[in-house]
Amino acid sequence: MPRERGGGGCWLLPALLLLPPLCAPALAISVAAEDAKEQIERLVSQESEKSGKSNKINIELQEIVFVIQSQSNSFHSKRAEDLERNILKQAEELGKELPRVLLIHQMDRHDGAWTILPLMHDFSASYGRNSSWIFFCEEDTRIQIVKLLETLRRFDKSKEWFLGKALYDEESTIIHHYAFAENPTVFKFPDFAAGWALSIPLVNKLANKLKSEPLKSDFTIDLKHEKGNGPHLTPVPEFCTDDLNSYKAVHCATMFSNFLPVCGDPVKKEDIFVAVKTCQKFHRDRIPIVKQTWESEAALVEYYSDYAETSIPTIDLGVPNTERGHCGKTFAILERFLNQSSSKTPWLVIVDDDTLISIFRLRKLLSCYDPNEPVFLGERYGYGLGTGGYSYITGGGGMVFSREAIQKLLASKCQCYSNDAPDDMVLGMCFSGLGIPITHCPLFHQARPMDYPKDYLAHQIPISFHKHWNINPVKEYFTWLAPKMEDSFTEKKQRRIREDL
């Protein structure tokens, strides 16, 4: 598949199948026990008055299988387990039989389980006869169980339903392979943060279809945009991404707040080493943008090129520039970090020369990760996941490595098959072979702000964007990523400013 050539050496993969989720920032897992109990009792009472059949809740609760799109990294697995406990606690407060709750990362027999489709056969075989709904949610999705039951009751469970909060592209975009170019707004796809549901008849149909028609695309780029010939998404207003404390939340079955996680003090500036991939032909137009925007946020930054220029300065790694891939350059950066940087520097970030990034926010995010674990963090894509492939971090949005991950990688002797091999994909293949899962964070972005639905970005505090073409990159940086935004505006004001641009 052709890949669009990126700046300092990364590529943007045009999508045939189109990513999901998840790093998932901080959100309180539960309300105080007494408040939660009172709220549930009130909702149950209201529901009983409406239907006159209190037993209906029991039956329907047992018919829902909750699937949390979790990850195996210790930070994420704990968040998913907290959500699982919250779901079960709500069910227990109702005094009913506990529902089934599944965590994606525990389904380790499926390397591509996060893409959901490989699990359809198992869902159909295990739950096709005794369940009505598969409900998917992210680690930070918050669920009002009674309200969810009330919402699903509106839909005939014997029919094929695909339910969620609808997103759409206002303009055709490369991350969705310019799908529906004439009018991209016609295709609606779910915001995973709000949760989404498939009725069992649709699950069974998909399982049968995938048996006879295996996935045709090698690449998984934006899972929430994947599409087929089945039922279109039915928008459900009760599936929300409003904050728990919002006045709108009272009407919501689900809520979500993707605030930046704070797990302690932000990591120190000196704990992050930033490597910028560039080449001589971009020294004059791209490097000045870096210096006008995020460079001052980084205490340790070096520019790696095919030409040493003291005025920047750039470092020639002895790897010739290539027209595609840049794997040789990336592995040379990894070697240099391990052998020449201070052994006390726990984190390495590799970005392209046209990546816009907030080091300020990254420092907060990394407070949630243990640098003693092998961490490989960024925006997740997939290659050949239906046929034994692997996941990888797409380079344009930034690739974050713990020192431990780099040590294990280089000790394995896994390497580029050529200097111009796609670096991000080779890294994904190497880490997969080592049994080290990549960690996905939706706050890293391979494309520009305009390439994502406004409503999707509205519940994010982004860490990076990529590409300078057809935008003013300095303006985009100060609109979306500059540190002063946290100091000057509330999240609500940020959202209003962004929507007005």
What is the predicted function of each stretch?
Residues 2-501:
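Secretory-pathway lumenal glyco-enzymes, predominantly type II signal-anchor Golgi glycosyltransferases
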